[in-house]
């Protein structure tokens, strides 16, 4: 009997701790005004019996999921809210705050601003479909574990951050992981064939893996037996010949991968280099290479985490530097800046080389208009 009593005590202790934890969590929700409750509603929760707190709170919930989740993490893990923030290295150029705390939320574009920009820049911007009618899709491909290369520790944070960002921008996000180059190509063709693109106004393709100059590494890659998805394959799959559903619509490609082994930094003098001879070409020497009535490759923009031949850096506890700053800049500026301006904000945050240097680069830009995302519209 004494043994049975001894065995039951830990269960009772756990039950008691669980009730106290949940009660404290609910009180934190109310105290920090996460749910924006009226005073009368707050009083009901404070005064409710322990077993009734959850029911009373559910009856009063508002649309504050993200803040509520952060309060939950802070209460559950008993950590300071600043301990989970992702911060730029101290020596980087003053740029966007990279905290993922309560301030790191997607700023929405006021409807009046949306209407104003659409009117003032009509003909200069890509048209945005009505939210109720559009079916935006986004694809994230991320390889973390490899057969012959080290794991990409911290990549899970990149997936989570990009998925939340794209969903906030109105995209239904498909995530694919652990893919060989052949698997990646198969996923791309299937995604390009999705019917939803017909009623969409754009798409995002996000690739996160090890990489080389010409492509993205699959899970079986090695120097002896390369397993690489060429960048050309991505553009070919979604061009106007193979993906008519996205014709004349922005196709945004985000790449977090090394593009070589160089460190991307160099000691230089203040003396300007000699100017190279300018390149000129007479129009009489130009010939057409295609007879299509529409451009084969148009409305693309690729944003890579580094310049060619250079590495990209990833914090194993916080995620990739590029993805972290990309998300921050979207959250801060997508409401008022077009896509190329947002990308420039990201580049500016890397402008001053730190201990680990890299410079994100825009490539194969064939967008003929400005692409505003107008979050919230």
UniProtKB/Swiss-Prot annotation:
Entry annotation: catalytic residues: 210, 258
Annotated localization: Cytoplasm, Cytosol; Cytoplasm; Endoplasmic reticulum membrane; Mitochondrion
PTM sites of type Phosphoserine: 83
Pfam families: CARD, Peptidase_C14
SMART domains: CARD, CASc
GO biological processes: defense response to bacterium; defense response to Gram-positive bacterium; innate immune response; positive regulation of inflammatory response; positive regulation of interleukin-18-mediated signaling pathway; programmed cell death; protein autoprocessing; pyroptotic inflammatory response
InterPro entries (UniProt xref): CARD (IPR001315), Caspase-like_dom_sf (IPR029030), Caspase_cys_AS (IPR033139), Caspase_his_AS (IPR016129), DEATH-like_dom_sf (IPR011029), Pept_C14 (IPR002398), Pept_C14_caspase (IPR011600), Pept_C14_p10 (IPR002138)
Catalytic activity reported: Strict requirement for Asp at the P1 position. It has a preferred cleavage sequence of Tyr-Val-Ala-Asp-|- but also cleaves at Asp-Glu-Val-Asp-|-
Activity regulation behaviour: Activated by homooligomerization induced by direct binding to cytosolic LPS, in a TLR4-independent manner. In addition to LPS, CASP4/CASP11 may also be activated by oxidized phospholipid 1-palmitoyl-2-arachidonoyl- sn-glycero-3-phosphorylcholine, an oxidized phospholipid (oxPAPC), in dendritic cells, promoting adaptive immunity. The role of oxPAPC is however unclear and another report suggests that oxPAPC competes with LPS-binding and inhibits the non-canonical inflammasome in macrophages.
Region (Required for LPS-binding): 1-59
Enzyme class of the recorded protein, top EC level: hydrolase
Residues of the CARD domain: 1-91
Alphabetized PANTHER family for the sequence: CASPASE RECRUITMENT DOMAIN-CONTAINING PROTEIN 18, CASPASE-1
Family: Belongs to the peptidase C14A family.
Domain notes: The CARD domain mediates LPS recognition and homooligomerization.
Quaternary structure and partners: Heterotetramer that consists of two anti-parallel arranged heterodimers, each one formed by a 20 kDa (Caspase-4 subunit p20) and a 10 kDa (Caspase-4 subunit p10) subunit. Upon direct LPS-binding, forms large homooligomers, resulting in its activation. These oligomers are often referred to as 'non-canonical inflammasomes'. In its precursor form, interacts with TMEM214; this interaction is required for association with the endoplasmic reticulum membrane. Interacts with CASP1. Interacts with NOD2. Interacts with Serpinb1a, Serpinb1b and Serpinb1c; these interactions regulate CASP4 activity.
Function description: Inflammatory caspase that acts as the effector of the non-canonical inflammasome by mediating lipopolysaccharide (LPS)-induced pyroptosis. Also indirectly activates the NLRP3 and NLRP6 inflammasomes. Acts as a thiol protease that cleaves a tetrapeptide after an Asp residue at position P1: catalyzes cleavage of CGAS, GSDMD and IL18. Effector of the non-canonical inflammasome independently of NLRP3 inflammasome and CASP1: the non-canonical inflammasome promotes pyroptosis through GSDMD cleavage without involving secretion of cytokine IL1B.
Protein's name according to its UniProt entry: Caspase-4
């Amino acid at each position: 009997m004494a043994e049975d009593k001894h065995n039951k005590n830990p269960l009772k202790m756990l039950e008691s701790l669980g009730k106290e934890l949940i009660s404290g969590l609910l009180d934190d929700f109310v105290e920090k005004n996460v749910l924006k409750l009226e005073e009368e509603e707050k009083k009901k929760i404070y005064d409710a019996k322990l077993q009734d707190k959850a029911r009373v709170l559910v009856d009063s919930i508002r649309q504050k999921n993200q803040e509520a989740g952060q309060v939950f993490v802070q209460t559950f893990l008993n950590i300071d809210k600043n301990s989970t923030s992702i911060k730029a290295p101290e020596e980087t150029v003053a740029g966007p705050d990279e905290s993922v705390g309560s301030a790191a939320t997607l700023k929405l574009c006021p409807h009046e601003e949306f209407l104003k920009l659409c009117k003032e820049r009509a003909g200069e911007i890509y048209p945005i479909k009505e939210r109720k009618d559009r079916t935006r899709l986004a694809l994230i491909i991320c390889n973390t574990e490899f057969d012959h290369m080290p794991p990409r520790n911290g990549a899970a944070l990149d997936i989570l951050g990009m998925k939340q960002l794209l969903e906030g921008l109105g995209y239904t996000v498909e995530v694919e992981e652990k893919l060989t180059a052949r698997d990646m190509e198969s996923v791309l063709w299937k995604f390009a064939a999705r019917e939803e693109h017909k009623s969409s106004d754009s798409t995002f393709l996000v690739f996160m893996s090890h990489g080389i100059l010409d492509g993205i590494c699959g899970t079986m890659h090695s120097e002896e037996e390369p397993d690489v998805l060429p960048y050309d394959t991505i553009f070919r799959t979604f061009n106007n010949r193979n993906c008519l559903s996205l014709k004349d619509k922005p196709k945004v490609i985000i790449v977090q991968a090394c593009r070589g082994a160089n460190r991307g930094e160099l000691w230089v003098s203040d003396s300007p280099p000699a100017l190279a001879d300018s390149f000129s070409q007479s129009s009489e020497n130009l010939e057409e290479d295609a007879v299509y009535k529409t451009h084969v490759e148009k409305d693309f923009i690729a944003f890579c985490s580094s310049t060619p031949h250079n590495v990209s850096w990833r914090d194993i506890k916080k995620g990739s530097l590029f993805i972290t700053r990309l998300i921050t800049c979207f959250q801060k500026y997508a409401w008022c800046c077009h896509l190329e301006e947002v990308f420039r904000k990201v580049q500016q945050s890397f402008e001053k080389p730190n201990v680990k240097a890299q410079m994100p680069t825009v490539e194969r830009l064939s967008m003929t208009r400005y692409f505003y995302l107008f979050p919230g519209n």
